[in-house]
From Swiss-Prot:
Record-given protein name: G-protein coupled receptor homolog U51
Stretches in topological domain Extracellular: 1-14, 69-79, 141-166, 222-236
Cytoplasmic side: 36-47, 103-119, 188-200, 258-294
Molecular-function annotations in GO: G protein-coupled receptor activity
Originating gene: U51
Membrane topology: Multi-pass membrane protein
Swiss-Prot/TrEMBL keywords: G-protein coupled receptor, Host cell membrane, Host membrane, Membrane, Receptor, Transducer, Transmembrane, Transmembrane helix
Length: 294
């Protein structure tokens, strides 16, 4: 809490503005690619649940920006609601992404096992992730409220500051626990996979764990240090690092939801930019030869 007076809130609000525009455009791009160019229907409901949760989180960024610039002066209760919605939307997206990964893993298994487990998963999944996400978001929001009970002024600024201090909780809830659930699920079914499928799953798990740790771990470890004495602007950078989830969660959702994410992206860009940019080899093929000119 010693770093609060040193935080450049206007700079942080400006960074939030850029994050909002880039992340909103990026999310819309991924949704278009998934809807138009992804032939796989496995786990589509989980895919769009993850995208919906991240969309809510992104749309809350301008609200945070308005509070950081003192454009809106809201009460303590409204600030708690804002922090709850922000945490809930992200936690819900993380659990929906976990269920998407589990269903995609079932798709690699034998048909009988796949059908039975997919039905059970769909029947139980959404009530479980709703209850789990609400419980975890309320728990974190109560920590915000308890730590700021005697600090009524600039409450939302302090709540956003507290979000960096509670980063290790979000790291456990949204990265470590889901990753280990999927890992043990794969470990239990490893004999059902081809080697290339198993390698692909392990690679995706490693990427998700790496980007999640990159997002939350620095803020949780360096929280007790006076970061601005170490490096000016490091404190704001750590808070901004927490927002990297608006990029890596949709990206992992897109990669996991597609049968071939490279093919889907290639089809999208070819359709959009083919009239303007053609490969030299394609141009040569389209040019008439000497024998056909006459």
């Amino acid at each position: 809490m010693k770093n609060i007076d040193l935080t450049n809130w206007k700079l942080l609000a400006e960074i939030y503005e850029y994050l909002f525009f880039f992340s909103f455009f990026f999310l819309c791009l991924l949704v278009i690619i998934v809807v138009k160019f992804n032939n796989s229907t496995v786990g589509r409901e989980y895919t769009f649940s993850t995208f919906s949760g991240m969309l809510v989180y992104i749309l809350l960024l301008p609200v945070k920006m308005g509070m950081l610039t003192k454009m809106w002066d809201v009460s303590t209760d409204y600030c708690i609601i804002l922090m709850f919605l922000s945490d809930f939307s992200f936690i819900f997206s993380s659990w929906a992404l976990t269920l998407l990964a589990l269903e995609r893993i079932n798709n690699f298994s034998f048909s009988e096992i796949k059908v039975n487990e997919t039905k059970i998963l769909k029947q139980m999944s959404f009530p479980i992730i709703w209850v789990t996400s609400i419980f975890q978001a309320v728990q974190i929001s109560m920590k915000y409220k308890k730590s700021q009970m005697n600090l009524e002024d600039d409450y939302c600024l302090l709540a956003i500051e507290r979000s960096a201090e509670e980063a290790w909780i979000l790291l456990m809830y949204t990265v470590v626990i889901p990753t280990f659930i999927v890992f043990f699920y794969v470990l239990n079914k490893r004999f059902l996979f081809l080697e290339r499928d198993l390698n692909s799953i392990v690679t995706h798990l490693s990427l998700f764990l790496f980007f999640g740790a990159l997002c939350f771990f620095p803020a949780s470890v360096l929280n007790e240090f006076n970061c601005n004495r170490l490096f000016y602007g490091l404190h704001e950078l750590l808070i901004v690092c927490l927002e990297l989830k608006i990029f890596y969660v949709p990206t992992m959702t897109y990669i996991i939801s597609c049968e071939n994410y490279r093919l889907a992206a290639k089809a999208f860009f070819c359709k959009c930019f083919k009239p303007c940019f053609l490969m030299p080899s394609l141009r040569k093929l389209q040019q008439p030869t000497k024998s056909t000119q006459f």
